[in-house]
Amino acid sequence: GVLVNYTGIACPNLIDQYDQSDLPLTESACGGIFMLPREVYEKVGGFDDDLFLYHEDHDLSWRIRMMGWKLMVLPDSVCYHHYNFNKGVLKFYQSEKNRLHILLKNFECKTLCLIAPAIALVEFSQIVHAFFHGWFLLKLKSYMEIASQAIKISRKRRKIQAARKVADKEIVSLYQSTISVAGLKNPLVDYFLNPILK
């Protein structure tokens, strides 16, 4: 599974860790390896075509949980995935655009209002990060893309919220309160961002 912060930032902090036999429920399946019944996939509408790369697995998992199904980790299963944490140009743009897309689409209104300050803080941090890496225009492009899809996102949102069986309170309890990525140490994240997000 994949650990995710409630602002939508993926937190792959179990990479290169020893296997555990008592892994808890997870809020998001990893798109690299997961299995689910076709009936479940079709019931939740499958993958969102607007999420070409990144967070498409998070979105599908979220909608599965909203319909009352659980996501389990099977520690005895083995899959080899040559993963390389690389925050390149394409990944940054697609990840940022899709992260905001699914937050706006899947959270209840009251949840969005409650976490709006945290989302604003993370957005500010991502803008600063983008500026120093030469990706500022890509970050702006992600906002423009979200704005251009506002009506479409709103339609999807109404459909999803009308069909949901599980409230955010249960789902959000599985999200991470901090941002943590294995092998990545950033003093600004560790000593500024995470204490506030908690």
How would you name each of these model-derived features?
Residues 66-172, 182:
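Active-site-adjacent helix/loop segment of glycosyltransferases
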Residues 53, 125, 130, 196-198:
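Conserved short hydrophobic patches within well-ordered secondary structure
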Residues 1-52, 58, 67:
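Acidic/His-rich active-site region of diverse nucleotide-sugar glycosyltransferases
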Residues 18-26, 154-198:
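Glycine-rich phosphate/pyrophosphate-binding loop
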Residues 57-60, 82:
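Generic detector of well-ordered alpha-helical packing
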Residues 60-61, 99:
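Short, hydrophobic alpha-helical packing/hinge segments within bilobed ligand-binding/sensory domains
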Residues 29-30, 34, 43, 53, ...:
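Aromatic-acidic/polar surface patches that form glycan- and anion
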